[in-house]
Design a protein with these regions (language model features):
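Flexible juxtamembrane loops connecting transmembrane helices in multi-pass membrane enzymes
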Residues: 30-31, 104-108, 120-153, 173-176
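Aromatic-anchored segments of alpha-helical transmembrane domains
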Residues: 10-15, 70-76, 118-124, 232-241
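Transmembrane alpha-helices of multi-pass inner-membrane enzymes
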Residues: 227-240, 244-286
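Membrane-interface junctions at the ends of membrane-embedded or membrane-associated helices
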Residues: 1, 56-64, 96-105, 219-221, ...
Length: 286
């Protein structure tokens, strides 16, 4: 499953790269990211793939190139969610690699200290130029952003219909949401989506789902399942500003498939221990 997430992320990254190759002249005019319809979906796929790439980087340092590629393509999508959550996930993934390699930690600390200031300086110099097309009055996030309106509307819908919400098929929010034909009304926020469209029933259902998944990850905890946990966390993050986990295909399906794989992992207490090691369990890919 980690290979699937990894391959999907690389494929998405190459799709984004191909888009810029085909529109290179327009990009070179001011070096600002260009709009394309599937940028938020691309950001979602790249974000959940970062932990998978980090898992392989923990075993083979050549995969750090993929981690860098996925993060750079996240920036090139022009998604503000990709920028904010992608940077957070990159740091978590690097911390994961650090944790998985006790014998290399001294080396990683030296590299981190040497590269920290140049990396931050590069990001500060690069982001305003790349995201110039997304700026409103010099701010990356405007107080008038429609996501604020969606979130408030979700709370209002919950107050009006606290038990079941307004329903997934309700179109009464159409004036503030211009979705594609056949789509439900998205609130672009996980909390607002559950409260506004499903009410307390949705809170109980999704609350139990979250509890069950976290409990499963804890019971099966290992370096492999930690990578799955990071991918799940990435999906939860992107769901705070995009449809994310509420899209049945492929987002929700990927999460279901991922937890099927996690469920087939051995329980922590049952993981065999390597000969000559009293505390380090053997880590398997599947």
């Amino acid at each position: 499953m980690l290979q699937i997430l990894y391959a999907g992320g690389l494929f998405t990254g190459f799709v984004v790269a191909l888009f810029y190759v085909r529109n290179l002249q327009e990009f070179l005019q001011d070096f600002a990211t260009l709009y394309f319809k599937y940028r938020n979906f691309s950001a979602t796929m790249l974000l959940i793939a970062l932990p998978a790439a980090a898992y392989f980087a923990a075993h083979d340092r050549r995969h750090f190139l993929s981690v860098a590629f996925l993060y750079f393509m996240l920036l090139m999508t022009g998604s503000r969610s990709g920028l904010i959550f992608g940077t957070a996930m990159l740091l978590l993934c690097l911390a994961y690699v650090y944790y998985c390699n006790p014998e290399r930690r001294a080396f990683y600390r030296r590299v981190g200290l040497i590269s920290l200031i140049p990396a931050v300086a590069l990001l500060i110099a690069l982001v305003p130029r790349l995201f110039a097309s997304r700026m409103v009055d010099g701010a990356l996030i405007s107080p008038d952003d429609s996501r604020y309106t969606f979130f408030i509307q979700g709370l209002l819908d919950f107050v009006k219909n606290p038990l079941f919400g307004c329903g997934l098929g309700s179109m009464h929010n159409a004036p503030i949401f211009l979705g594609v034909e056949g789509s439900i009304v998205w609130y672009h926020n996980l909390i607002a989506q559950i409260l506004g469209s499903m009410g307390l029933v949705g809170v109980v259902g999704y609350g139990w789902l979250f509890y069950d998944r976290v409990r499963l990850l804890w019971r099966k905890r290992s370096r492999t399942t930690m990578a799955f946990a990071l991918s799940y966390f990435a999906m939860l993050l992107i769901s705070m500003t995009n449809p994310g986990m509420f899209c049945p295909m492929p987002n929700a399906l990927l999460m279901v498939a991922m937890f099927v794989v996690v469920e087939r992992q051995p329980d922590t207490a049952a993981v065999p221990v390597k000969v000559g090691s009293a505390s380090t369990p053997e880590r398997r890919l599947f």
